[in-house]
Amino acid sequence: MNLPIEAHGVCTQDEHGVLAVRYSKFLPSTEKTNSFHMDANSNEIVVHLVEDAAIQDIPTAWLKLYLLSLRYFKPNELNFDNIFSVLPNLAWTNNGPMRAENLSDLNLNEDLKIFALDKFPPMADYVIPKGVRIADASRVRLGAYLGEGTTIMHEGFVNYNAGTEGPNMIEGRISAGVFIGKDSDLGGGCSTMGTLSGGNKAVISVGERCLLGANSGIGISLGDDCTIEAGLYVTAGTKVTLLINEGEEKIMKALDLSGTSGLLYYRDSLTGKVCAKPKASSFTLNKELHENN
């Protein structure tokens, strides 16, 4: 699907405005500018996304999140600038979304269950992609892109504007902006450095058939067929000893290896230095875990 898009849905709102939108139909738009129209009597809403500009309103923010989770667009293909300024912080409850600041006014005797205080809802409350498994639905935000065959285990987390090509095994954290190539595995507790906070400005990606060991992490991109040893965090500034041939090595910044395929990153257990060398074998997923999602 390409822009311009006309989206139809039903919104949840209070006296201050729109809280959430549940979209159900997407068509080509004939409008010339971004706009939305809401029927006050039925809460039905029509949104026109013509230009992929910075987000200015809640309905457009929700539409862009939907478009990723429905696999119409991949991470980093839409502009999400301003989304944190536009979306309110909400309590996601068994009675639907409500403003977090209003919780103190509620009757404490009410049977109210609060699942989260966040600007983004769990994806599975609004979109169920075909062919995925999510062990804990609260750990995948709306706006995540999960390719068919993806398995998210209990400790896995996927932010908005991030995701997987599928099939993939995810037991670690996929930060905003990060995209994981097919047949790659993120081990338990591993981390991918995003661009929402801190000093990292580069968008991180992981290629195909990669393995990030348990409690490892990356601040650089990986090409295809790479492995990060368990417990090793490779940031852009990490000094890496590249073993080129037997007896030949070169010390370089990890950033200069970003995107390189076929490397094994590990820490020398005798010297403590971080090393990289060409891999002798390739990694494969257990297909049985992903074919019947």
Please provide the spans of the model-predicted regions.
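A generic secondary-structure signal marking the coil-to-beta-strand transition
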Residues: 17, 130, 136, 148, ...
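C-terminal amphipathic alpha-helical segment
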Residues: 194-263, 267, 271-275
